[in-house]
Amino acid sequence: MFRTLVKTDALAVEDQTVPVRYFELRTLRGAKRYSAEILLGPGDRIILDDDSVTNLEARTACLVPATIYSRMLARTTAAA
């Protein structure tokens, strides 16, 4: 199965800009599925999937800041 790039975006959180790529995939039954690839860093990705790009955009807008802030907190706690 092949993914088709349908959209690219970038989310700004604090001083970071996180690139996001949205893909479309056809299932074996012919239905469309969408995925978002969130690139947090080299070798550090989050992949989400849903039935629509709109839902993925909403989930991404909530998940990316939460992920970045939780990792910042974990680093601060580990350093202390």
Feature locations, PLM:
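Mixed-charge, Lys/Arg-enriched low-complexity segments
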Residues: 42-80
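Extended rod-forming repeat segments used as scaffolds/tethers
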Residues: 16, 31, 57-58
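A short, structured beta-strand/loop element
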Residues: 19-48
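Intrinsic disorder/low-complexity segments
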Residues: 11, 23-25, 51-53
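Negatively charged, low-complexity tracts enriched in Asp/Glu with abundant Ser/Thr
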Residues: 1-20, 79-80
